[in-house]
């Protein structure tokens, strides 16, 4: 993994992590089911990483933290969910959120070629699929009565403040 290249204008760095879990022992997984496993991982993140996303929304709600850059080592799963939740809080339509999420596939092209060449069965781990984020949204809709309720009640997001900060 290459070192972070953070713009010189960044004035503060706030590490905020969600444990990815130990994916090193792939022997226990049926590698043909990796897409289904990743769908389940997105559901797991929604259900079990709420403290971290609550802190994320606290940070992005503070004007002193704007403008804001957030990222992750791969930048597609945990960060993809964060971006989707933030865009949802800002009132962006889900279709547009999904289009934005799917752009990650384009930006990740080539990044994992050596791994996929050596282990083609790992290819689904190196990209995004709409089913992954759809699984997260389905969980939010069914378990938390929709995105706005999830954001406000589970994550403590101040949607009005976020919209005032990030939209015109």
Annotate each PLM feature.
Residues 74, 78-79:
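Ser/Thr-glycine-rich phosphate-binding loops at phosphate-binding pockets of nucleotides
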Residues 1-69, 82-168:
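Cys-dependent protein tyrosine phosphatase-like superfamily
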